[in-house]
Amino acid sequence: MNDTTATRCGYVAIVGRPNVGKSTLLNHILGQKLAITSRKPQTTRHNMLGIKTEGAVQAIYVDTPGMHKNGEKALNRYMNKTASAALKDVDVVIFVVDRTRWTDEDQMVLERVQYVQGPVILAINKTDRIEDKSDLMPHLEWLQGQLPNASIVPISAQHGHNLEALESLIASHLPENDHFFPEDQITDRSSRFLAAELVREKIMRQLGAELPYQITVEIEEFKQQGRTLHIHALILVERDGQKKIIIGDKGDRIKRIGSDARRDMELLFDSKVMLNLWVKVKGGWSDDERALRSLGYGDL
């Protein structure tokens, strides 16, 4: 970010269709893993704040679920509502799109972003993979026509290409404000929430297309005992068949999930972690508004 004598602070919404690179972008800006990622759409389910303070500038990023068309369950409605709500009361909107690909879900996000009154930045992701940059021009010109007042910044969320320019532009749009959070705080989310998300990420990465999205993780115990952090996590699925898939042959799969999650937790929490995982069937939870609220999904 640019150095400035003025103290600046504001909220920055990161929006886009599922699996376009929003969470990867947030993690790279923060310089550490905070938001979970996988190649599967709809990995992110909640708005999460990622806070970066650099000098006089504090940018508070809101990582959002990908807006999507398919899915009529209560969980899908929650995710779309959550993402749309992030466009309100923020100071800057980053609309992440692919370098060439445009889908109906991109169009759905665009139609919401067009109503935004404040600054909009189009972050064109994965542009480092294009050898001849002139191939980008037709897509960029079309996008500029859809959002005439938006700034366009080509980036690579994965490799960090051009993120310094993106952050500098964001900083220039933030209002003069005292900082809302302490300098060393990087998120508004609890350690329990982050632990649950890491377990869910490893499940999605291990299973891929084998497992539908009717899965969530609840932390039942989170306790520091001496130098070891003891975490008990409950994995909720909707059918017995899903439970068997997660556990795997002789428990091999759930052991790999636990091992991978524990490794990331130890880095995040800077502590030795003892992680225990259980799998429980709770039929229909993803379409049960009361169950969703009890699991921390808020109002639907």
Curated annotation (Swiss-Prot):
Coiled coil stretches, renumbered: none
Domain Era-type G stretches: 8-176
Keyword rRNA-binding in record: yes
Region described as G1: 16-23
Region (G5): 155-157
Domain KH type-2 stretches: 199-283
GO cellular component term, pick one: plasma membrane
Annotated stretches, region: G4: 125-128
UniProt keyword annotations, A-Z: Cell inner membrane, Cell membrane, Cytoplasm, GTP-binding, Membrane, Nucleotide-binding, Ribosome biogenesis, RNA-binding, rRNA-binding
GO biological process: ribosomal small subunit assembly
Disulphide-bridged cysteine pairs: none
Quaternary data: Monomer.
Functional summary from the UniProt entry: An essential GTPase that binds both GDP and GTP, with rapid nucleotide exchange. Plays a role in 16S rRNA processing and 30S ribosomal subunit biogenesis and possibly also in cell cycle regulation and energy metabolism.
Family, similarity comment: Belongs to the TRAFAC class TrmE-Era-EngA-EngB-Septin-like GTPase superfamily. Era GTPase family.
Protein name per UniProt: GTPase Era
Organism for this UniProt entry: Pseudomonas savastanoi pv. phaseolicola (strain 1448A / Race 6) (Pseudomonas syringae pv. phaseolicola (strain 1448A / Race 6))
